[in-house]
Amino acid sequence: MPVAVVTDSTAYLPAELSGTYDLTVVPLTVVINGTNGLEGLEIQPAEVALALRARRAAVSTSRPAPSQFTEAYQRLLDAGFDGIVSVHLSAKLSGTFEAATMAAAELGDRVRVVDSGTTAMGLGFAALAAATTAGRGEDLESVRAEAADHASRVSTLFYVDTLEFLRRGGRIGAAQALLGTALSVKPILHVVDGAIVVRDKVRTAGRALAKLVDLAVEASGDGEVDIAVHHMEAPDRATALADAVSMRLGDRLRDCYITEIGAVVAAHVGPGASGVVVHRRP
């Protein structure tokens, strides 16, 4: 049998694609006031938003246990797959990659783990490319290489109303968080070398979103691209972002997706967050 592809729940694949590709998804966990819930299965973004607005609620996230990956990998191997490529969110943002690597070590060279260096559809585009390659019957190394190549072809940009939630979760330093809150500055962030850093600062939310469009177009280069627009409880803003980027890119835009971020990333970016992932096609 061909190669199986595994990813994690932070890929946030659009609903129209989730049933089209053969992917196994291992969920991360969200913890609200001490109660654990699996992302996408037991807890949804709206519950996280409600807890974050409550202020007194304690919200955190945790990686899957290595045993969750071991079980998923073994199930696929028992089903007859020759090998597995497991593609995950940045190792600098989560212990998920580490947990997957620990599980893979128990199974020899039949499992290859890829650090996408990003999250959301930045991860999703890499996982989809791997699944497409696996579907053609390519070998284990070819599928791994395709995942890594497409992960290198994405730019992940996003706007948050406040850096406070990222600071609380340890995903951004206190100094950068202070910069983002000074004088009511609205921060635009991006993922660089697997870490979240402030890319730009503007005075209003409107200017931040306009800048996000400019940066997405800049990141697209000169060739054909796909984009994914993410949001947390901001569908109208996401639609406006998608329309603005689409208009600027014209015929170079191949596919455009709009999808709400899941509970794990929602716990760190907070209500109102919006993002654009640019995938530069080979």
Predicted regions and their residues:
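Short beta->alpha junction loops
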Residues: 63-64, 115-117
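Short catalytic-loop micro-motif centered on adjacent basic/acidic residues
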Residues: 60, 86, 113, 228-229
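Glycine-rich oxoanion-binding loops at beta->alpha junctions
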Residues: 51-77
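N-terminal short beta-loop-beta anion/metal-coordinating cradle
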Residues: 20-47, 62-69
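N-terminal glycine-rich phosphate/adenylate-binding segment common to multiple enzyme folds
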Residues: 68-100, 104
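Mixed-charge interfacial surface used for oligomerization/domain docking
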Residues: 4, 10-20, 24, 28-31, ...
